[in-house]
Amino acid sequence: MTYFVLFLGLCFVLGGLAVASNPSPYYGVVGLVLASIAGCGWLLSLGVSFVSLVLFMVYLGGMLVVFVYSVSLAADPFPEAWGDWRVVGYGVSLITVLVVGVVVGGFVEYWDFGVITVDSVGMFSVRLDFGGVAMFYSCGVGMFLVAGWGLLLTLFVVLELVRGLTRGAIRAV
């Protein structure tokens, strides 16, 4: 199980690197989906299944809409792929900066902590996941409204960016 969690963490980092290092949104969306699945799988392995499901649905629902509109705006006949030298160099430089930051920053000493899952406290404890469901529906209502309003505003901003000069989002095919 430990190796699986480490594998999910590696997939999460590689997915984020794929989104950050690729200038073409055609291939960047693959990195986004990989990072989202790995991050939610990581939460799922810790026992927080409801939060993982909500984050997966909200994150992919909101971000894939933005990627669809940016793909329609980019419309390149020959998009740059991950195998291009510029993209590979950018990814290698991001990994180098990350490794140097971890080594120089002294974070290697703090890797000794253990992971506590939600069922490790005892038989009479309430699972954190069930407490999260109650918090989502009681105290989190305002945050859900703010997040929904932000996603709606982002949708209108992207629609305005894709609109073009005169005809709106409709283009000649």
Curated annotation (Swiss-Prot):
EC number: 7.1.1.2
Any one GO molecular function term: NADH dehydrogenase (ubiquinone) activity
InterPro entries: ComplexI_Subunit6 (IPR050269), NADH_UbQ/plastoQ_OxRdtase_su6 (IPR001457), Nuo/plastoQ_OxRdtase_6_NuoJ (IPR042106)
Record membrane topology: Multi-pass membrane protein
Positions of disulphide bridges: none
Record has Signal as a keyword: no
Pfam families listed in its UniProt record: Oxidored_q3 (PF00499)
Main location group: mitochondrion
Compartments where located: Mitochondrion membrane
Keyword Mitochondrion: yes
Catalytic activity, reaction form: a ubiquinone + NADH + 5 H(+)(in) = a ubiquinol + NAD(+) + 4 H(+)(out)
Gene3D superfamilies cross-referenced by the UniProt entry: NADH-ubiquinone/plastoquinone oxidoreductase chain 6, subunit NuoJ
Annotated transmembrane regions: 1-21, 27-47, 48-68, 87-107, 113-133, 139-159
Gene Ontology CC terms: mitochondrial membrane
Keywords carried by this UniProt record: Electron transport, Membrane, Mitochondrion, NAD, Respiratory chain, Translocase, Transmembrane, Transmembrane helix, Transport, Ubiquinone
Record family assignment: Belongs to the complex I subunit 6 family.
The protein's role, per its UniProt record: Core subunit of the mitochondrial membrane respiratory chain NADH dehydrogenase (Complex I) that is believed to belong to the minimal assembly required for catalysis. Complex I functions in the transfer of electrons from NADH to the respiratory chain. The immediate electron acceptor for the enzyme is believed to be ubiquinone.
Annotated protein name in UniProt: NADH-ubiquinone oxidoreductase chain 6
Organism of derivation: Alle alle
